[in-house]
Amino acid sequence: MTDHMIALVTGGNKGIGREIAAQLAQLGHTVIIGARSLERGEQTAAELRAAGGSVTAVALDVTDPASVAAAAERVGAEYGHLDALINNAGISHQPGADFAGQLPRTADVDHVRYVFETNVFGVITVTSAFLPLLRRSDSPRIVNVSSSAGSLAAISDFSNTDPIALGYVPSKTALTAVTMMYARDLFSDHILVNAVCPGFVATDLNGHRGLSTPAEGARSAVAMATIPADGPTGTFTDVDGPVAW
């Protein structure tokens, strides 16, 4: 594990993202919380600093290229490089819509597109913007917070009782594939790119119905963010090991 690193966590002001930030800070790393609301991001950063962490916040809306570019510029100006990018920001459905309303037979394509904007295109936008800073690191790594809900092995199993959600589930399938594309493309650059599944965690994303705590859900991302320079790349794991593609 790297002794000290600069890490950015998108969606880091609450839920799993907050816990990822907290756990990385507890390990002695400098953490930048990316949040759509700078006020909320700074509030979380202040709380984590009060607990002894080196934590700051930056305004970052993953669906807004201008916001992402401004965040990358600020991080570059203040730190000069980035060691770990944790693409944690994600949504399950469009505000005001029902997650259960994503059945393919009745799904609204605009709803599906809205989910993909954050869960897939947002990750690509952020990763592309921060790649120059990651290239300046001695041990760069990218961690994408995906979900076993998008596992092709799981969703092709007709005995699977998980919700059929045309927006969320395929967005996580796509995110895992995006992870592999980056892992292969950046392999020769020695940038480690991996996907993790936090598990079914009680957060705003699922109405706090999850069975695990955010602290437990953060463990897989923190573990992958702190792997050594010769660690794995192109993997999809949870705290128990590999997740079926």
Where are these regions (language model features)?
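C-terminal helical subdomain
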Residues: 173, 188, 195-196, 203, ...
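Structural signature of the Rossmann-like NAD(P)-dependent dehydrogenase/reductase core
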Residues: 9-10, 87-88, 141-147, 192-197
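Conserved glycine-rich Rossmann-like NAD(P)H-binding loop of the short-chain dehydrogenase/reductase
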Residues: 27-43
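A glycine-rich helix->loop->beta "capping" turn
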Residues: 51-54, 74-87, 93-94, 108
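Catalytic loop of short-chain dehydrogenase/reductase
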Residues: 91-92, 100-116, 124, 135-188
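Canonical Rossmann dinucleotide-binding motif of NAD(H)/NADP(H)-dependent dehydrogenases/reductases
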Residues: 2-32
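The beta1-alpha1 cofactor-binding region of Rossmann-like NAD(H)/NADP(H)-dependent oxidoreductases
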Residues: 38, 59-73
